[in-house]
């Protein structure tokens, strides 16, 4: 089962998050039929979104959107404080040969000219929006830059996805380390040294390391785990929600659907679920107006 952990380390000077998202990203790949490079880009983004969501409280939620100008188009992911995450890419059928490091060429798929935005719904009247320029297109580095620039928290983000030859997901996961105010230079140096030597997060997950063990590896010491949260692909779409959207089109538009097609089909971007509305259902919706 996928899950994430929230922890502290170095006598409370470092806040840390780590997640195994393998099953969750496998479900996203299955629903969207993403090709390997698109799977890696979507998986990295969803993993980051679920860890950012873990920083929220209660019913708070967020939406991440990456638009880098590459062939994959936009990558969108929703996360919340409960470990729910969902996501999609504009063009799921993108794949390139491995890059010079022998890894999936996510940068080429995402592009390097555009923005990463995070919109938080904290239950207040206004939404909180943070936006930064994309700095690498590799996604982990872009989220690091977002946290440092937009939220002013010195951070390190690692996200990774390994894809099997048959397109299924072999391993997926990530970590976020954040320095709290007053962190001393010795701790910073130790973390930097450790991060430069540790294996990629996807390799650690593939080897069977738990999120707790991943944090111990990247931190260089055992973390104090504060909370464990299950992670899962969850979509809150429903036929009722789409019905409300159809009603919002107005009587004339609904009548046109009835006259031209005798039915209507609505598809959720996030989970690819399709909802069919029969002629009788459309007439009932029309008559509600």
From Swiss-Prot:
InterPro entries: Heat_shock_Hsp33, Heat_shock_Hsp33_C, Heat_shock_Hsp33_N. The keyword Disulfide bond applies. One of its GO terms (molecular function) is protein folding chaperone. Gene3D superfamilies: Hsp33 domain, HSP33 redox switch-like. Disulfide bonds join 235-237, 268-271. GO terms for cellular component: cytoplasm. Keywords: Chaperone, Cytoplasm, Disulfide bond, Redox-active center, Zinc. One of its GO terms (biological process) is protein refolding. Signal peptide: none annotated. The keyword Zinc applies. It comes from the Bacteria. It is found in: Cytoplasm. Pfam families: HSP33 (PF01430). Under oxidizing conditions two disulfide bonds are formed involving the reactive cysteines. Under reducing conditions zinc is bound to the reactive cysteines and the protein is inactive. Redox regulated molecular chaperone. Protects both thermally unfolding and oxidatively damaged proteins from irreversible aggregation. Plays an important role in the bacterial defense system toward oxidative stress. Belongs to the HSP33 family. PANTHER family: 33 KDA CHAPERONIN. This is 33 kDa chaperonin. It comes from Bacillus licheniformis (strain ATCC 14580 / DSM 13 / JCM 2505 / CCUG 7422 / NBRC 12200 / NCIMB 9375 / NCTC 10341 / NRRL NRS-1264 / Gibson 46). The gene is hslO.
